[in-house]
Amino acid sequence: MKSHRFVPTVAPLTLALLGLATFHASAARPHRQYVPDTAHSISTSWGLVQQPTLPTQVCATLKAALMPVGGSLDTLDQNPAHSKRDTARLQAAIDDCPASSAVHLVPGDAGESGLLTGPLTIKSGVTLWIDRGVTLFGSRNPLDYDNGLGTCGTATSDKTKSCKPLIHVTDTAKSAIVGAGKIDGRGGSTLTAGPNAGTASWWDLAYLNVTKGLSQHVPRLLQIDDSTDFTLYDITLENSANFHVTTDNVVGLTAWGIKILAPSLVYSRPGYHCPAGSTPDVNPHATCFTPETAKNTDGFDPGQSKNVLLTYSYIATGDDGVAIKAHASSKRSIASENMLFTYNQFYYTHGFSLGSETDSGMRHIAVRGLSIDGFNSNDVHTDPYSANGLRIKSDGTRGGQVYDISFENICMRGVARPLVFDANYANAAVRSKLPSFSGITLTNVHSLGSKAFGGGELSFYGYRDAKTTLPIGISLDNVVLEGGKVSFAKRHFGGPASNPGATHFTFKGGPVSFFDQLTESASNDVQLQGKPGPGVQLQCNDAFIAYHSVLPDSPI
């Protein structure tokens, strides 16, 4: 069988970001021999990563049998007995597939494009290949996902997780999900079974955390655990009920050319202009959603993992675009390290985040060539931590060492809080795991400002309590925030007396637009080393591209 090498069209955004980048050899120190990035290879600290290719060996080809209406299967699975009609044949094909082969999902003979499934498990060495035009839809029957606790599809005061993910990858090596098709979690579709059948969607349940303080029990889209060398390539992940991609103890993850979106046009309107009274903040059974009301739909969340690459990808969700976690459990403590994020575009998100769980350590993480278009969105009334650009967050209950973190060649616009470095993210009476941020570097960062928020609000807020001060160590070189003077977040949760506080700044010679608003303070442990100088701000004219030009069912 001949090799299928699909080379996606490189969008103007990625070409622009590739062109403006000042290349470094790797995401982590010590550097490997310098090898320049190209459109088909990325240099990392763990080696040169080549653009993935489509499989050459196919063990089974499965044809889609369902015809979606307007991108939805809701008219076809109203009966909960029909909620997972393709699960058995999909799982059987995966289980019977030998390593180094793929299960290939293709359109039906009459143009059918949909498959409907409950939870699936990917076998070690096996690739799930979803062809262009094909969508794998997740069930909207909570009983299909329940892990035995009986509360999947509800919102309760108990935070114990009760739903299996739609796709689970565990104890695998060299497995993958590839192809130009889609996986749709159907977060905005009305549930068909359980106590909320006919009255709420997954996202309606998630919004009860805002209105009633309850914990939603809903499935993640893709969970990858205890695995090595997993690949996501060219796939679109949409409308997850919760996080789209999460990992735990993964060594080697390449995500290349993926697109993540929540909500899509199936659950919204162009420009996210929902009709009055249709969203879950005012209607408990919503008919339209915005990013602000599709809660906890994080895009890409690598946790306790290393050798992670996300490149040439697009993310618009109702929460963090990327959220890196590093949390020690009772069984093990695994750092998040050696991660590289290059040539990516964010839209509506809560930004690029590290934390708040940092207690098992984070190190050697680089973000390069990132564009963030915040659309002047600010969900401050229901989530004061939304609308960020670059963020590192932790607190005294889940903190650890965070060091060697670099942000380079970053363009932003319409972002309320462009820079947030906060070691006092939450309050707690007992503080036994203290956060320490050091070796943080910002180089060539340019925010074009916001019509709604001007220059935006910043936080440089290191850890301080009655006994301990752990200052942030951060260097700035050519960091320009337009839109007028910036403001600084108010002091909070018993941290330093003012913001900036407990922060040691180093200026590397390039311009820093807010330098004149910084003042040294011995009592507040603010130090300024060096001075900014003249320089040319990073050119961001070509750094933003409409998402619908890349993914047609995007509302923006």
List each model region and its residues:
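Right-handed parallel beta-helix
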Residues: 132-133, 173-182, 228-238, 251-265, ...
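An acidic- and aromatic-residue-enriched active-site/binding cleft used to recognize and process polar
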Residues: 108-110, 120, 125, 133, ...
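Extracellular beta-rich repeat passengers
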Residues: 378-556
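Solvent-exposed loop and beta-edge segments used for protein-protein assembly and interaction
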Residues: 84, 97-99, 122, 171, ...
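Asp-box/BNR beta-propeller blade signature and adjacent active/binding-site loops
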Residues: 84-87, 91, 325, 329, ...
